[in-house]
Design a protein with these regions (language model features):
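A short, polar/charged loop-to-alpha-helix boundary motif
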Residues: 12-20
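Conserved GNAT acetyl-CoA-binding A-motif
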Residues: 45, 52-64
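Conserved acetyl-CoA-binding loop-helix of GNAT-fold acetyltransferases
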Residues: 27, 31, 37-50, 73-77
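Conserved beta-strand in the GNAT
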Residues: 1-10, 25, 30
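Active-site/acyl-donor-binding loops of N-acyltransferases
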Residues: 84-93
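Conserved beta-strand-loop-alpha-helix junction that forms the acyl-donor binding cleft
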Residues: 60-71, 90
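Conserved acetyl-CoA-binding loop of GNAT-fold acetyltransferases
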Residues: 57, 76-85
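Conserved acetyl-CoA binding element of GNAT-fold acetyltransferases
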Residues: 19-33, 87-88
């Protein structure tokens, strides 16, 4: 049974707080609720980091919404440091 997934990629444009390019980027991670707290997300993250390292990345980054406290805790526990906060805007044309 699938218990979760992670999506990662390479970003060659500017990534907040980084100094190299490309940067490995965790686009998203999800673990089914009944499997949370068992290290699944951390294992998925480590696999993404290993993949990015194989692609020549010296840095790895991610983001989460300001209101997603659980994700912020996950990132900090996984060794990430907060690089900044942004407010996103849209408008109709």
């Amino acid at each position: 049974a699938d218990v979760g997934f992670a999506q990662c990629g390479l970003r060659r444009d500017y990534v907040e707080g980084t100094h190299t390019s490309p940067v490995g980027y965790l686009e998203g991670v999800f673990v089914q609720e009944e499997y949370r707290g068992r290290g699944v997300a951390t294992a998925l993250l480590r696999a993404c980091e290993a993949w990015a390292g194989e692609k020549g990345c010296a840095e790895f980054a991610s983001d989460c919404g300001l209101d997603n406290a659980a994700s912020a805790v996950f990132h900090l526990r996984a060794g990430f440091a907060e690089a900044g906060r942004i407010i996103c805007f849209t408008k109709r044309l």
